[in-house]
């Protein structure tokens, strides 16, 4: 049986890029694209709807809040419409949505539980990953391997996971620690984890987190806090 795949895109003020992201998603693979509008003040929701996405709103600001809203939407669908696999994808066009094929393949073919799209293993455009992101990824993934025994190379947001496994993780983070919480909990629960190389380019528009010193410090602190929280 062909699995149902739902894509969740948290989005805050991504009017320039959101249509491009949605248009590049392989429609033959995906049953629904859900854009979680996180209090955008621009044309993000209208552009997402015009591109064919389902748009839902989350007024509480935070990447994790938006992702949790998307999960709730997926979980509450009727049994015959409920997705088997959730793909998380950012709305800034830094990832390559067409690589969803490679991202979901280990789940479908090898019964893997969670797949992380690794920019470290893939091809990142020069300057797309800021120095603080590269450094933070290296430190965080080494700590996860040391403390939880699972080797990752990236904490990137482009990822796929079985819905039943995602619900089992009982995700709670509402801000910067979202991706690392998922990986740490998956490692702790002994989920079957793997990574696939993905491409990465400079985002459209300015980064809301890594592009500022204060954002980078807050994100780094939250990531470290989350890694140690679940020991």
Per-segment meaning from a language model:
Residues 37-46, 93:
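A conserved acidic beta->alpha catalytic loop
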Residues 80-94:
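Short beta-strand-to-loop acidic/aromatic patch adjacent to the donor-nucleotide binding site
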Residues 9, 21-22, 30-40:
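Short beta-strand/loop segment that forms part of the nucleotide-sugar
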Residues 16-20, 42-51:
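Acidic helix N-cap motif at the loop->helix transition within catalytic regions
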Residues 59-61, 65-73, 97-176, 202-214, ...:
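Acceptor/aglycone-binding surface of glycosyltransferases and processive sugar-polymer synthases
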Residues 31-34, 45-80:
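Conserved donor nucleotide-binding strand/loop of the catalytic core
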């Amino acid at each position: 049986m062909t699995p149902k795949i739902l894509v969740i895109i948290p989005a805050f003020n991504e009017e320039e890029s959101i249509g491009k992201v949605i248009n590049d998603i392989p429609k033959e693979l995906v049953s629904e694209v859900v854009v979680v509008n996180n209090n955008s003040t621009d044309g993000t929701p209208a552009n997402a709807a015009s591109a064919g996405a389902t748009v839902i709103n989350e007024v509480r600001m935070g990447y994790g809040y938006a992702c949790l809203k998307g999960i709730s939407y997926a979980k509450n669908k009727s049994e015959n419409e409920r997705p088997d696999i959730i793909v998380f994808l950012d709305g800034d066009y830094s990832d390559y949505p067409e690589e969803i094929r490679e991202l979901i393949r280990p789940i479908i073919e090898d019964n893997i539980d969670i797949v992380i799209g690794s920019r470290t293993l893939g091809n990142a455009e020069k300057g797309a990953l800021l120095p603080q992101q590269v450094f933070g990824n290296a430190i965080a993934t080494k700590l996860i391997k040391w403390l939880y025994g699972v080797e990752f190379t990236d904490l990137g947001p482009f990822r796929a996971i079985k819905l039943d496994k995602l619900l089992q993780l009982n995700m709670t983070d509402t801000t910067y620690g979202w991706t690392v919480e998922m990986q740490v909990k998956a490692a702790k629960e002994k989920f079957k984890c793997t990574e696939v190389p993905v491409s990465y380019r400079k985002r459209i528009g300015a980064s809301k987190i890594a592009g500022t010193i204060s954002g980078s410090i807050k994100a780094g602190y939250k990531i470290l806090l989350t890694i140690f929280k679940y020991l």
